[in-house]
């Protein structure tokens, strides 16, 4: 939200480019037996109706599909920064996928080559990259990466004619304010540009899920309904963000 505030106040100049995605090691989630995570002693590899929670349905997407199966998590905040459906729009998309290796390797490493799931043919590329062109000229790169060993990241980068912010490493650079060719730590910038919604409700939000995001999003929606204002996200946003999934499959 602080980064959005920086954009709104013109800190980065005219926006040129953004990156985002869903980069989250979900291999254990995709084969969860409901009793143990598979890397723990005694865990079993399961998927489908005999599995637990997301492993009942999520893993099947990796079998049937090859595209960005979850673009909305990352593209939402970027779309807000780029004024998508509010003076700007997505124009075109081109996507590509790597080979599919991670899930099969995970099964073999944890269950052996003779495990029944080792026969499953996974279609989803381990890393799917979609490039989007916007009507106002900007480009966006969206990455889906859930079958690889890695720390969690949404890969945010917002870049303009006068600077940029990257969430990996918490970096900010602003021309004529940062030291030349040296990153600033984002903490001081975030304090300066803290969003009023966050600063006002930070204490309450801290008790909610996903680092406070759940609280802020629900508060913003309920506040809009209560005051009869436009919702912060609407059905047109949902359609634009979700279309990336189907279009990436068509492109690949």
Listing of model-derived features with the role each one plays in the protein:
Residues 42, 99-125, 129, 133-134, ...:
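C-terminal glycine/acidic-rich active-site capping loop/insertion
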């Amino acid at each position: 939200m602080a980064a959005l505030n920086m954009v709104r106040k013109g800190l980065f100049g005219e926006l040129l480019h953004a990156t985002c995605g869903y980069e989250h090691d979900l291999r254990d989630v995709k084969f969860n037996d409901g009793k143990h995570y598979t890397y723990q002693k005694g865990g079993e590899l399961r998927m489908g109706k005999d599995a637990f929670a997301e492993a009942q349905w999520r893993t099947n997407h990796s079998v049937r599909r090859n595209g960005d199966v979850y673009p909305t998590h990352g593209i939402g905040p970027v779309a807000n920064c780029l004024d998508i459906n509010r003076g700007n729009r997505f124009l075109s998309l081109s996507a590509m996928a790597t080979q599919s290796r991670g899930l099969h390797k995970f099964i073999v490493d944890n269950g052996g080559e003779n495990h029944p799931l080792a026969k499953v043919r996974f279609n989803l590329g381990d890393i799917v990259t979609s490039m989007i062109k916007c009507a106002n000229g900007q480009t966006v790169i969206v990455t889906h990466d859930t079958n690889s060993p890695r720390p969690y990241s949404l890969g945010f980068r917002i870049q303009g004619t006068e600077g940029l912010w990257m969430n990996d490493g918490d970096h900010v650079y602003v021309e004529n304010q940062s030291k030349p060719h040296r990153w600033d730590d984002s903490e001081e910038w975030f304090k300066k540009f803290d969003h009023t919604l966050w600063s006002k409700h930070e204490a309450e939000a801290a008790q909610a899920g996903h680092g406070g995001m759940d609280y802020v999003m629900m508060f913003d929606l309920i506040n809009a309904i209560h005051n009869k204002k436009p919702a912060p996200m609407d059905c047109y946003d949902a359609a634009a963000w979700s279309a990336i999934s189907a279009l990436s499959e068509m492109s690949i």
